[in-house]
Amino acid sequence: MIQLTNINKTYNNGAPLHVLKGINLNIEQGEFVSIMGASGSGKSTLLNILGILDNYDTGDYYLNNVLIKNLSETKAAEYRNRMIGFIFQSFNLISFKDAVENVALPLFYQGISRKKRNALALEYLDRLGLKDWAHHMPNEMSGGQKQRVA
């Protein structure tokens, strides 16, 4: 599903900083992967590339057998929306929307009807043990509950 071959990334802020050097990685569908390393080792840069939030300089990145290079913003957003999930270290919920509405929001951008969005969001919340919190606002939830909703 994800294949990186010889990925390189350099930031040019005055002196060039080569943060990723020859990264090779294969992740199959259904695998759970952790990216670990020392501070400043390039973890966030790698994750930003995997999430199609940043470009790489050289190498090849294939997502579902599609080369991820020089995509239009529209195409990149489509792939992010349909094929990539994020769990951010810091997260944000929309404060004036309840748990169902926050969970359903990405489905809106996929053109799914409100009825189906809400049904799917309730199903996801149930899987996370949060069905009883579906209509609670973020300020009524614990930090852990908010993390799961996000």
Predicted regions and their residues:
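ABC family nucleotide-binding domain
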Residues: 1-150
